[in-house]
Every structure is written in structure tokens, then in C-alpha cells.
């Protein structure tokens, strides 16, 4: 057996001791409700941090006192377990540990990070990459290989911080090498996180790699200044000034793809899904700046991601307004097998807030689905059902005042566009209306006309009366109200 094989065998033996040596352990770490058993002699031999820790605890192998408060990454102390029946009790055949097991609570690092640190201390080897396609906390992508996702980058950064805290420089260097390969395929916001970590830990090679990647991302200095310190932005601008590629890329549109790596066709679908999930989380948090960063730095297509449709369904008016003002999304983009626009969804939701903000940003009130249905047809159908049935299936709590206001807003927009086109106005959208077989309109036409006459006065008067009589205190739907409640959509776009 060669010396290399002997070292590998020794490494595996020590790693097996960490995994299966509970019966011989004399210390355990309690992290996130789980116990990680270890051995003081191994940890003290491999780490100066643990040597100093254990030298101050229980030198005569008596039941140890509670450990003193520890500096980051561990805090607090816990009592020792009893010999046979404690938490550090027997493993395997039921024998008791040679010495009472010391249990140390760890609260500032997570379980996966602690296990990685201990694996390196025992075997001299560790990898921040999770098992291929296996679960990794923080990553919800199915089948993700965790080679460049945000969760893998976060795990590597946490491991780097723990290695520095424990004084394990070999592990820190190993993680640095792995991060250098990860950032070349990571998103630009993850690269900026690694950039700041490399600055904190004074890792020059990692800093150089990340700074050049950010410089090549195409993000403007103003946008970088919102996410990075000004001195870091200045250094990135210096790199750009020295690079001939920066001058060539400068005239390009800020909404063209600026990603610094060619896409791998095998993983393009997973990349797209990951971007959409991150975009939706950003919209849920009203973080439009992050969405803008994804558009400019990663080439996110907001129309392909159905960003406006999602924001209309799940966010408030302000988020939809800010998203449309980015100028990177088509307000009339279509989604789903029927080709609905965001205005169709707002009409189905009976949300005056969404209808008004979409119309303010040039949504087409005459847009049709593949079935020839316009937003006005949707509202007329809901109104007909409300008049004849008293309630709309799936929208049992529909407010008639909101329905009237939505109908008036869309009808007014249709009249304006029809007048601008020079065509006669015949009942709202006659020139582009849907087939009569889709929405029966002949019997309810008179009711619809009377319903929409003077709708503003009816809306304001009934809203005030309802507030006085029932004390509900609803705000008038003038664009300053709260976002519409979640509703059932009979023909969702997904």
C-alpha cells in the first residue's frame, strides 16, 4: 500500500469515528435541536480554538461545570450529561462513554456548517457542494446540483466564516478555492456577496476574481452604489476603465443581457425557473431594485417570467406601478393557453386599483384572448351573473361598487381608444367585442346600461352609506386603498 493510500485510509477511519463513534465521544454540540458527537482529543489536536476551550474545562475528568460563554460562533453553556443515561449515553452495544459527555450548545452557526468544519478537522477533506440533486436548506429548486445556486454560495460563505473563527486556515483556503469556481457560474447578486466576504477576510485572489466579474456584468455605477460601498464601486470602475471590453459594452441598452458566461443548454430550464422564483420573492418583498438588478445583470425577461401578471395577482398597486415604470415589461403581454393580459386578470379580480394602474400605463382595453374575449367582456359577464344570480361563483364576497367602478374605468378607456381610432362607439367594444355566444348580452343590455350610468356618484354614495351604517370604514377605491384580497381565478393564467 502506497503512502497516499495509507493517508486516505487514515482519513476515512477518522471520518468514520466522527460518524459512528458516539460510544467513545466525550463532547457533543447541540445545534438546531440536533446533537453532533465528537472527541476532545481530536479537536484539540487539530484546532487551537478547541485546545484552549477544552484546557479550561474539566481537566480532572470530573463532571464538567457549565462552559464559559464562548466567542462567535458558539455562545452559552450547558450542563454535562450523566454517564450511562444522559444525552451522551451509549451507542452501539450499550456501553457507557469513558468520561461523562460534555454538551455545548451552539447557536450562531447552522448544523450543515458545523458538520463541514468537523469533517475537515477529522479527515482533512471537505466540500461545500451538497450531494448532487440532494436537498440543501434555502434552495427550493428540484434537481438542483447546488454548484452555483444562492444556497450553495451561502453555505460556502458561512463555512468560510466558521473556519476563520475556529482558526482552521486550511479549510478557509479550501473554501476559497471552491468559491472561485462557484462565482464564475453564480448570479451577479451572489457574486457581490462573495466580493464583500473576500474583502472582509482579505482574500486577494477571490477579491480579484469577483471584482472582475462584477465589472463585466454591465451594471451601472449608480446601481452598484445601492448594493456596494462607494470605495468598492470606485475600484470596479477603475477595472472597467482599464478594460477595452468595457468601452465596447458601454453603449448597449441597460436591458439587454449582460451575463458574463454563456448559458449551458442542459441547465437553461433550471436557470429560468430559478430566476423566476427569485423574481417572485423580490416582488413579494416589494424589492423592485432587485428585480431591476436581475434584468440588467442576468438578462431576466420580465415578459417570459410573467412578472406583470404575477404582480397583479399577488402584490399591491405600488409594486405593479414601480414594475411597469422600469420600462422592461410589456403591459399587454399575454399568458397562458388563452392568451390573457394583465388587464384580463385585473378584471377577473374586480380590482379597481389594478385596472386603473394598468390603464395608466397604456394597457389595451380592447385586447382579446384567443377566444376573442376582452376585459370589458369579462366585467360584463361578471355583472350579468351578479344581476341574475346574486353572487359570482368563486367571488362570493364581490363588492358591487368595485364592479361598477371597474366597468366604468374599462368602458371609458374603450371609448377613448375608439374615438382616437376614428371608429364609432357602439356599446363599448362593438368593433372588437366578443361573440354573442360567449357572453349573453341581449337580455341584460338594459340592466347593464342602467347599472353603469352615473357610476361614480352611485359608487361614492353607496360606499359612504355603507361606511356609516355598518361602520366598516372601508377606504374609497381611489388608488390609495389596500391591495385587493386573494381571490379564486376561474381561468388562471398559469
UniProtKB/Swiss-Prot annotation:
Q: Where is the composition biased (Pro residues)?
A: 61-71
Compositional bias of kind Gly residues: 75-94
Where along this sequence does the record place binding of Zn(2+)?
139, 144, 146, 149
Question: Where, subcellularly, is it found?
Answer: Nucleus; Cytoplasm
Naturally occurring in which organism (per UniProt): Oryza sativa subsp. japonica
Q: Which GO terms describe its molecular function?
A: transcription cis-regulatory region binding; zinc ion binding
Q: Name one GO cellular component term.
A: nucleus
Alphabetic keyword roster? ANK repeat, Cytoplasm, Metal-binding, Nucleus, Repeat, Ubl conjugation pathway, Zinc, Zinc-finger
Q: Which family does it belong to?
A: Belongs to the plant 'ANKYRIN-BTB/POZ' family. 'NOOT-BOP-COCH-like' (NBCL) subfamily.
Q: How does it assemble?
A: Homodimer. Interacts with TGAL5, TGAL7, TGAL8 and TGAL9.
Q: What is this protein called?
A: BTB/POZ domain and ankyrin repeat-containing protein NH5.1
Record's function text: May act as a substrate-specific adapter of an E3 ubiquitin-protein ligase complex (CUL3-RBX1-BTB) which mediates the ubiquitination and subsequent proteasomal degradation of target proteins. Transcriptional co-regulator involved in the promotion of leaf and floral meristem fate and determinacy. Required for the abscission of senescent organs, probably by regulating the cell wall disorganization in abscission zones (AZs, e.g. pulvini at the base of leaves).
Q: Taxonomic classification, please?
A: Eukaryota, Viridiplantae, Streptophyta, Embryophyta, Tracheophyta
Q: Which stretches does the entry tag as region Disordered?
A: 60-94, 421-443, 469-494
Give every BTB domain span: 25-130
Amino acid at each position: 500500500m502506497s503512502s497516499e493510500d495509507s493517508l486516505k485510509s487514515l482519513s476515512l477511519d477518522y471520518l468514520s469515528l466522527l460518524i459512528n463513534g458516539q460510544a467513545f465521544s466525550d463532547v457533543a454540540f447541540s445545534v438546531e435541536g440536533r446533537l453532533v458527537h465528537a472527541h476532545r482529543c481530536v479537536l484539540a489536536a487539530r484546532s487551537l480554538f478547541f485546545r484552549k476551550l477544552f484546557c479550561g474545562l474539566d481537566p480532572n475528568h470530573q463532571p464538567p461545570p457549565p462552559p464559559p460563554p464562548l466567542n462567535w460562533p458558539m455562545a452559552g453553556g450547558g450542563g454535562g450529561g450523566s454517564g450511562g443515561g444522559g444525552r451522551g449515553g451509549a451507542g452501539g452495544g450499550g456501553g457507557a462513554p469513558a468520561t461523562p459527555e460534555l454538551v455545548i450548545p451552539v447557536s450562531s452557526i447552522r448544523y450543515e456548517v458545523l458538520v463541514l468544519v468537523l469533517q475537515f478537522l477529522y479527515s482533512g477533506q471537505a466540500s461545500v457542494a451538497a450531494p448532487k440533486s440532494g436537498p440543501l436548506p434555502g434552495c427550493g429548486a428540484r434537481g438542483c446540483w447546488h454548484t452555483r445556486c444562492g444556497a450553495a454560495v451561502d453555505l460556502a460563505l458561512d463555512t468560510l466564516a466558521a473556519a476563520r473563527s475556529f482558526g482552521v486556515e486550511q479549510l478557509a483556503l479550501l473554501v476559497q478555492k471552491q468559491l472561485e469556481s462557484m462565482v464564475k457560474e453564480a448570479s451577479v447578486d451572489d457574486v457581490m456577496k462573495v466580493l464583500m466576504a473576500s474583502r472582509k477576510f482579505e482574500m486577494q485572489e477571490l477579491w480579484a476574481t469577483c471584482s472582475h466579474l462584477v465589472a463585466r456584468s454591465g451594471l451601472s455605477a449608480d446601481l452598484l452604489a445601492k448594493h456596494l460601498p462607494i470605495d468598492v464601486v470606485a475600484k470596479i470602475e477603475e477595472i472597467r476603465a482599464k478594460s477595452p471590453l468595457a468601452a465596447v459594452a458601454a453603449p448597449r441598452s441597460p436591458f439587454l443581457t449582460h451575463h458574463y458566461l454563456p448559458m449551458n443548454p442542459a441547465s437553461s430550464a433550471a436557470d429560468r425557473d430559478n430566476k423566476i422564483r427569485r423574481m417572485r420573492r423580490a416582488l413579494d418583498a416589494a424589492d423592485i431594485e432587485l428585480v431591476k438588478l436581475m434584468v440588467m445583470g442576468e438578462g431576466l425577461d420580465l415578459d417570459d417570467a410573467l412578472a406583470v401578471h404575477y404582480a397583479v395577482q399577488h402584490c399591491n398597486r405600488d409594486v405593479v406601478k414601480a414594475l411597469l415604470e422600469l420600462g422592461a415589461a410589456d403591459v399587454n403581454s399575454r399568458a397562458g393557453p388563452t392568451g390573457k393580459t394583465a388587464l384580463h386578470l385585473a378584471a377577473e379580480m374586480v380590482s379597481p386599483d389594478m385596472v386603473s394602474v394598468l390603464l395608466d400605463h397604456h394597457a389595451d382595453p380592447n385586447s382579446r384572448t384567443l377566444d376573442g374575449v376582452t376585459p370589458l367582456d369579462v366585467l360584463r359577464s361578471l355583472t350579468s351573473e351578479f344581476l341574475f344570480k346574486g353572487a359570482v361563483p368563486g367571488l362570493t364576497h364581490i363588492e358591487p361598487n368595485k364592479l361598477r367602478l371597474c366597468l366604468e374605468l374599462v368602458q371609458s378607456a374603450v371609448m377613448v381608444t375608439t374615438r382616437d381610432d376614428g371608429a364609432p362607439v357602439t356599446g363599448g367594444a362593438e368593433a372588437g367585442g366578443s361573440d354573442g355566444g360567449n357572453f349573453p348580452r341581449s337580455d341584460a343590455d338594459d340592466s347593464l346600461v342602467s347599472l353603469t350610468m352615473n357610476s361614480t356618484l352611485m359608487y361614492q354614495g353607496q360606499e359612504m352609506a355603507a361606511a356609516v351604517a355598518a361602520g366598516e370604514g372601508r377606504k374609497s377605491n381611489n388608488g390609495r386603498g389596500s391591495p385587493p384580497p386573494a381571490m379564486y381565478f376561474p381561468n388562471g393564467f398559469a
